[in-house]
């Protein structure tokens, strides 16, 4: 008794790549929003708030496959990096470095949908 077995394979790699590429901007936007909140928390915890202007100025921008977080306040770099007379209070660095697992979780949650 002969058994005929046949199957057909279809390559969907291109579609999968397109789907993943289409999700990247939304993932980066979600990470940017989270990073903004984390930077605000870092500034507040460091007691680096006088008028609240720096804290209110924190924003993010998605550009291609990257997200940037920063401030347009002229004294932001001095707070972040310090000066010869003022100790650094790296709120932006900490907002990225201290929350890597949170950002990974955002990516994973989106990709599991």
Question: Which residues make up each language-model segment?
Answer:
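Short, Lys/Arg-rich flexible segments
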Residues: 1-113
């Amino acid at each position: 008794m002969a058994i005929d077995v046949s199957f057909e394979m279809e390559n969907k790699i291109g579609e999968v790549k397109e789907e993943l590429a289409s999700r990247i901007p939304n993932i980066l936007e979600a990470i940017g929003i989270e990073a903004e909140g984390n930077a605000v928390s870092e500034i507040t915890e460091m007691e680096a708030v006088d008028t609240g202007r720096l804290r209110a100025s924190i924003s993010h921008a998605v550009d291609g496959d990257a997200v940037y977080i920063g401030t347009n306040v002229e004294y932001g770099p001095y707070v972040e990096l310090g000066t010869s007379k003022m100790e650094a209070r790296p709120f932006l660095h900490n907002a990225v470095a201290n929350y890597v697992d949170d950002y990974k979780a955002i990516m994973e949650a989106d990709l599991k949908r």
